[in-house]
């Protein structure tokens, strides 16, 4: 029941947060990464990379959503991932929020002038599943209510 309830809440929040936005659930064939988001907002589905690791969607107002997976070849943990990202000295990249749990990590901040939100799940199957959302500050009021539900919908097998 604990695993089912957050998914149900996430789906309900997506619908409630944008009454006109139809939810779409994407499942990555290679890694089994699953995320649900409003397809009425993220309308431009980009071509899948040749390696099949995920998918990207763009919105008309400059937002981007990526749902993907990677093999955890370095045996990263949520804490090591956050520590590494916080230590990064990349220009235009600032983390303003981070949190970790037993098998997940969340980062938020600004990158290249956009607000970003990233959630990663560290699977027992050796796969890190990620949802990344970024958007211009000018549309913050539109996307802030959606981010939590979209990130909360991230799951894997």
Question: What is each stretch, according to the model?
Answer:
Residues 1-4:
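Positively charged n-region of N-terminal signal peptides that target proteins for export
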Residues 7-16:
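Bacterial N-terminal signal peptides
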Residues 46-145:
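Conserved polar/disulfide-associated segments of primarily extracytoplasmic proteins
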